Amino acid sequence: HTLVDHKDKNRSNNRIEKPHDYSEIVFSYVVSSQKKRDYCKFIKDIVERRLKTINIDSDAQTFLPEKESQVTEIEKIKENYREAWRKGEGRGNQESDDANRYSRPDYIKMLSSKKQKAHYSYSGFRQLVNISSGIVRHFLEPLSKMYEEQKVKNNGEPIIKIDDNIQNIIIRNESIDFFKEQFEHLEKEVDKNDIHEEKIKKLKNLITVLGENFHEILLSDLSERRVFSFTISDDSNVDKE
């Protein structure tokens, strides 16, 4: 759970208290460019300090590389956008704007259109930072599992990096487990009755549908494909309780 600037909340006659029951974030740290850079540097410093303690001489980006073929393809798309901008066909104010904004969504769209679908790789230091959404624990816990998996694969050989495939598998599994565990936790906390069970079911469905809609927007041709918030414009059928 993430709550912004809330100190406590009641739950089944018990008190929710940080940091045990939820993680607190300031939303501007997730969406503000400067705050994102600060958070990224903060994580980078943590990773590199920990690498030094286990005698690994590497920076965070080298230790957590993105899938090389993915980087190459995205860079090609970026160059196409930069070339279009130089011809006066771009949307952004600067040459890099469209390249940075649309290249990755276009790459994901390209993957989804293939008959034999290749999967997008959730790998690379910067991507893992973004996925953690401003919560340090959501970066470090998967990283710990990646490191252990790499140790097994290396079979005693020194670890100089985490394979992009290991990063991707761990992140995908963590995401599935996180979604599942949150609802299992919620089901244990609420009173067992049909009303609460139905509300949990509706909440799960809402989150699933929102995710599907956000994915559709990401693959669309809209000028802005990143969605941070939403509103319900017609709440006539929404349960008020």
Q: What is each residue range found by the language model?
A:
Residues 1-117, 166-196:
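The catalytic "switch" region of P-loop NTPases
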Residues 113, 117-122, 130, 134, ...:
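Winged-helix-like regulatory helical subdomains adjacent to P-loop NTPase cores
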